[in-house]
């Protein structure tokens, strides 16, 4: 299951948050972006439980991550 996570970060924490997300096993790619969100992460999860663990357990535990929106690819 492939998903894209749109991430809002606290001021001055985008680059460090991106570096930490790059180390997450299921993360395929993460990019800092401009606009409404600060980063976009592509995830390859085995199922919805795995996706939930990556987003809620790993990404949300990173200092500076303020909010996420998850989009599941079909």
Language-model segments: which ranges?
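A compositional/biophysical signature of low hydrophobicity enriched in polar/charged and small residues
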Residues: 1-74
């Amino acid at each position: 299951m492939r998903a894209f996570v749109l991430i809002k970060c606290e001021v001055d924490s985008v680059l460090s948050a991106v570096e930490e997300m790059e180390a997450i096993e299921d993360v395929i790619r993460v990019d800092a972006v401009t606009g409404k969100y600060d980063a976009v992460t592509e995830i390859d999860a085995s199922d919805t439980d795995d996706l939930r663990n990556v987003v809620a357990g790993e990404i949300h535990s990173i200092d500076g991550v303020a909010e996420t929106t998850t989009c599941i690819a079909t």
